C-alpha cells in the first residue's frame, strides 16, 4: 500500500491511498467465506458454496465492492498511521479507481488538529485584582452569622420592615381568581422584596388579622404582563432579635472563645476565598491572552459539532426547568441571532483553548499519575452524589475516563503556564498565586497516548462555567463513491 498526504488547509488534509490487488485478497477471501455461509444454494451445505457459484448468483462486481468496503477501514487506519495524521473527524472517502485484478485507489479527506506555535511562557503577563479584605466585609459576614442566631419573638404592633409575618395571599385578574396564586400561612420577611412587587408597601403598618389589597403586574404564566389584584391578610407578626456581639456570642456561634478571634478567622477565610477567586480570574485572563496571541484555526466540522452539542444541552436544560427558548432569550435580553452568534463565538474559543493547552501538554511532556486521577475521580463522584467505584464504572462504559484524564492534563497545563507567567495586580505589584502543588509527572505516562482528541464545552449557554469534555475520535470510513 502507498499513501500520500496533501494539505488542503491548516485543518484539513487529503490522503490518496493506492492498494495493489494482491493486498485485497484477504478481504476478498473473507467476503467469499461470509457469503458462503449466508447464501443458500441447492446442492451445497452452508459455508461450502464455491466462489464461482457465488459469482454467478451475486455477480463478481457486487462481491468485489463488498470486499473493498470490508477492507477500507483498516486501509484508511494504516494510511493515517503511516502519514501521522492527527484526525478530528469522520473521513469523506471516495474510490477513484478500482477494477477486478487491478489496484484500488481511494482518497480520504479529513479534518486534522492544527499546528500551534506557542509563545514563550515567561512573556505572558496578566493583571488580576489584588486580594483585599476590608473591615466592612468582615462585619458583613459577622452580621450574617449573627442573623443565623436571631430569635423571632411574637409582637402585638403594626408590621415594620425587618419583621417576619405569616400571610394568606390570593390574586385575581379582571375579577377572576388566578389558579395557583393562593397561599396560606406563608412566612415572609418584610422588606426582602423577594415575593411579590408591592407587597412590602402594602403590609407595612398593618396589624395582625388586617387585610390589605394592592395591584401588581404578573411576571409569569399566560397572563404575564397584565395587572392583578392581590389580597394579603396578616396572620401574625414576629420581631427578629439579634444576639449581642460579644465573647459569649463567639463561643456560641463558633469554636472560638473571643469575638476578636472570630473576627480574625472570618478575615482569614475571606482572604482564602479571595485568593481562590484570584486564581480563577488569572486562569480566565491567561486563556484570553493566549487566544489573542496564538492563531489557532478551528475545523468547521468540530465547530458545528460543538455548537450542536451545546444547543442539545440547552434544550434539555430548558425542558428541565419548564421553559422554552423564546422565554429564555427574553430573559437574557437577546435576539435569536445575537444568542447564536454568542454561542458560536464561545464554542470557537473553547475549541481553540483546548488546542493550545494540548500543545502545552505535548511540548512540556505533561503526564498524569494514578494518584491524581483517583483524586479527581473521588472529587467528581462526591459532586455527583455517588460512590467512587460506581462513578468509575459509569466513566468506563463510555469515553468518560478518557475525558477525565484530558481534563486533568489540561488543568495541569494551565497551572504550569500560570507558574511561568508574570502576574501583577492593578498597581503593578507582582502577585503570588495560591496555586495547588503540582506532583511530578509520571515518566511512564505519555500524554499523547493517554488521551484522545477531546473538546471542552464551556457551557450549555454562553457564560455557564461548567465544562463538559466530549471525545471526538476517528471512525470507520464512509464511502461516497465506488468503482
From Swiss-Prot:
The lineage of its organism: Bacteria, Bacillati, Actinomycetota, Actinomycetes, Frankiales. The gene is tig. Involved in protein export. Acts as a chaperone by maintaining the newly synthesized protein in an open conformation. Functions as a peptidyl-prolyl cis-trans isomerase. Belongs to the FKBP-type PPIase family. Tig subfamily. It comes from Frankia casuarinae (strain DSM 45818 / CECT 9043 / HFP020203 / CcI3). This is Trigger factor. Consists of 3 domains; the N-terminus binds the ribosome, the middle domain has PPIase activity, while the C-terminus has intrinsic chaperone activity on its own. It is an enzyme of class 5 (isomerase). The keyword Cell division applies. Residues 162-243 form the PPIase FKBP-type domain. GO terms for cellular component: cytoplasm.
Amino acid at each position: 500500500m502507498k499513501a500520500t498526504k496533501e494539505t488542503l488547509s491548516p485543518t484539513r488534509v487529503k490522503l490518496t491511498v493506492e492498494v495493489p490487488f494482491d493486498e485485497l485478497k484477504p478481504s476478498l477471501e473473507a467476503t467469499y467465506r461470509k457469503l458462503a455461509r449466508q447464501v443458500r444454494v441447492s446442492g451445497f451445505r452452508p459455508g461450502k458454496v464455491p466462489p464461482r457459484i457465488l459469482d454467478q448468483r451475486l455477480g463478481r462486481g457486487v462481491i468485489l465492492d463488498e470486499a473493498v468496503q470490508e477492507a477500507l477501514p483498516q486501509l484508511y487506519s494504516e494510511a493515517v498511521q503511516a502519514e501521522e495524521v492527527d484526525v478530528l473527524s469522520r473521513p469523506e472517502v471516495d474510490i477513484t479507481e478500482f477494477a477486478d485484478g487491478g489496484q484500488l485507489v481511494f482518497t480520504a479527506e479529513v479534518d486534522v488538529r492544527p499546528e500551534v506555535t506557542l509563545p514563550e511562557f515567561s512573556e505572558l503577563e496578566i493583571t488580576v485584582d489584588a486580594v483585599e479584605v476590608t473591615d466592612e466585609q468582615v462585619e458583613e459576614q459577622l452580621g450574617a452569622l449573627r442573623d443565623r442566631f436571631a430569635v423571632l419573638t411574637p409582637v402585638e404592633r403594626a408590621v415594620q420592615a425587618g419583621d417576619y409575618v405569616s400571610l394568606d395571599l390570593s390574586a385575581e385578574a379582571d375579577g377572576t381568581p388566578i389558579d395557583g396564586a393562593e397561599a396560606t400561612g406563608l412566612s415572609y420577611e418584610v422588606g426582602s422584596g423577594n415575593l411579590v412587587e408591592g407587597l412590602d408597601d402594602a403590609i407595612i403598618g398593618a396589624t395582625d388579622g388586617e387585610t390589605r389589597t394592592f395591584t401588581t403586574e404578573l411576571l409569569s404564566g399566560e397572563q404575564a404582563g397584565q395587572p392583578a389584584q392581590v389580597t394579603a391578610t396578616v396572620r401574625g407578626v414576629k420581631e427578629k432579635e439579634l444576639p449581642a456581639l460579644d465573647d459569649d456570642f463567639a463561643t456560641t456561634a463558633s469554636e472560638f472563645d473571643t469575638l476578636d478571634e472570630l473576627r480574625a478567622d472570618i478575615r482569614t477565610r475571606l482572604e482564602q476565598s479571595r485568593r481562590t477567586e484570584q486564581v480563577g480570574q488569572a486562569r480566565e485572563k491567561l486563556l484570553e491572552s493566549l487566544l489573542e496571541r496564538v492563531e489557532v484555526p478551528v475545523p468547521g466540522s468540530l465547530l458545528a459539532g460543538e455548537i450542536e452539542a451545546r444547543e442539545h444541552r440547552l434544550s434539555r436544560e430548558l425542558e428541565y426547568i419548564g421553559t422554552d427558548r423564546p422565554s429564555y432569550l427574553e430573559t437574557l435580553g437577546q435576539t435569536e441571532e445575537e444568542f447564536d452568534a454568542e454561542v458560536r463565538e464561545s464554542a470557537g474559543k473553547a475549541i481553540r483553548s483546548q488546542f493550545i493547552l494540548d500543545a502545552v501538554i505535548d511540548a512540556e511532556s505533561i503526564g498524569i499519575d494514578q494518584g491524581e486521577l483517583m483524586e479527581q475521580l473521588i472529587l467528581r463522584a462526591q459532586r455527583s452524589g455517588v460512590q467512587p467505584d460506581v462513578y468509575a464504572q459509569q466513566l468506563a462504559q463510555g469515553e468518560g475516563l478518557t475525558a477525565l484524564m484530558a481534563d486533568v492534563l489540561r488543568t495541569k497545563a494551565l497551572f504550569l503556564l500560570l507558574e511561568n507567567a508574570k502576574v501583577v495586580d492593578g498597581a503593578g505589584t507582582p502577585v503570588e498565586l495560591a496555586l495547588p502543588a503540582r506532583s511530578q509527572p509520571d515518566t511512564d505516562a505519555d500524554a499523547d497516548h493517554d488521551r484522545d482528541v477531546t473538546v471542552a464545552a464551556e457551557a450549555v449557554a454562553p457564560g455557564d462555567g461548567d465544562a463538559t469534555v466530549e471525545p471526538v475520535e476517528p471512525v470507520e470510513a464512509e464511502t461516497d463513491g465506488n468503482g
